[in-house]
């Protein structure tokens, strides 16, 4: 890891942040002990009250940042309602952070099917058995549901539930933060007016 902070050589000539994120994620994959793709996901409910929780990033390209969930969960309902979200990655071992926010779209059925099929069989059963974010009267009820769906799909493929898919955050802001001495940190923000717009870049006071 460089100790010199963020320099002009860290960025593409096209002012495009996704390549820099890919490099930082690669560094985190080599450095972080657990789940380098873990990210805090922030949403808001219909009253503007925020919620935040950890999810796992499952894809990133120049279209945006992808994760998967139950659309009937709290986060699923809030995203479907507001169509906006924010993320924050923190890699303590690297003394780095990336924040982003933007509009949210649903991934294609083909993308969701492909990722769902790659999951362990038990996780695919869990997508059917868990009524995510709703009250659970006891652990036995969940285990019973798992057993029932395991029996139902004992042979053959397990189809993807219609309420389970992926979201893609299409960012309008991505900020890269690097820790430096005396809290004189480096902060570089990439901004654009719309998810399809051109990026501009600005250095921020720490």
From Swiss-Prot:
GO biological process: pyridoxine biosynthetic process
Cofactor note: Binds 1 FMN per subunit.
Entries under PROSITE patterns matching the protein: PYRIDOX_OXIDASE
Involved pathway(s): Cofactor metabolism; pyridoxal 5'-phosphate salvage; pyridoxal 5'-phosphate from pyridoxamine 5'-phosphate: step 1/1; Cofactor metabolism; pyridoxal 5'-phosphate salvage; pyridoxal 5'-phosphate from pyridoxine 5'-phosphate: step 1/1
InterPro entries assigned: Pyridox_Oxase (IPR000659), Pyridox_Oxase_CS (IPR019740), Pyridox_Oxase_N (IPR011576), Pyridoxamine_oxidase_dimer_C (IPR019576), Split_barrel_FMN-bd (IPR012349)
Keyword Flavoprotein: yes
Domain of life of the source: Bacteria
Residues engaged in binding FMN: 53-58, 68-69, 75, 97, 132-133, 177, 187
Residues binding substrate: 58, 115, 119, 123, 183-185
Keyword set includes Transmembrane: no
Cofactor: FMN
Catalytic activity: pyridoxamine 5'-phosphate + O2 + H2O = pyridoxal 5'-phosphate + H2O2 + NH4(+); pyridoxine 5'-phosphate + O2 = pyridoxal 5'-phosphate + H2O2
Pfam families: PNP_phzG_C, PNPOx_N
EC numbers, comma separated: 1.4.3.5
Keyword set, alphabetical order: Flavoprotein, FMN, Oxidoreductase, Pyridoxine biosynthesis
GO molecular function, one term: FMN binding
Leading EC class: oxidoreductase
Subunit structure: Homodimer.
Sequence similarity: Belongs to the pyridoxamine 5'-phosphate oxidase family.
Its biological purpose: Catalyzes the oxidation of either pyridoxine 5'-phosphate (PNP) or pyridoxamine 5'-phosphate (PMP) into pyridoxal 5'-phosphate (PLP).
PANTHER family named among the record's database cross-references: PYRIDOXINE-5'-PHOSPHATE OXIDASE, PYRIDOXINE-5-PHOSPHATE OXIDASE
The protein's name in its UniProt record: Pyridoxine/pyridoxamine 5'-phosphate oxidase
Organism from which the protein derives: Agrobacterium fabrum (strain C58 / ATCC 33970) (Agrobacterium tumefaciens (strain C58))
């Amino acid at each position: 890891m460089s100790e010199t902070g963020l320099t002009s050589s860290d960025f593409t000539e096209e002012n495009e942040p996704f390549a820099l994120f890919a490099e930082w994620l690669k560094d985190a994959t080599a450095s972080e002990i657990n789940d380098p793709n873990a990210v805090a996901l922030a949403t808001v409910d219909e009253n503007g009250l925020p919620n935040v929780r950890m999810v796992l990033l499952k894809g990133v390209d120049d279209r945006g940042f992808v994760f998967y969930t139950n659309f009937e969960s709290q986060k699923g309902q809030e995203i479907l309602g507001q169509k906006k979200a924010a993320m924050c990655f923190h890699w303590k071992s690297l003394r780095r952070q990336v924040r982003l926010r933007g509009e949210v779209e649903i991934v294609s059925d083909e993308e969701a099917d492909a990722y769902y099929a790659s999951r362990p069989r038990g996780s695919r059963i869990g997508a059917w058995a868990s009524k995510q974010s709703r009250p659970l009267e006891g652990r036995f009820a969940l285990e019973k549901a798992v057993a029932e769906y395991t029996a139902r799909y004992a042979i053959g493929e397990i189809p993807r539930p219609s309420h389970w898919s992926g979201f893609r955050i299409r960012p309008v802001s991505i900020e890269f933060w690097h820790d430096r001495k005396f809290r004189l940190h480096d902060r570089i923000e990439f901004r654009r007016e719309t998810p399809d717009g051109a990026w501009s870049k600005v250095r921020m006071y720490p």
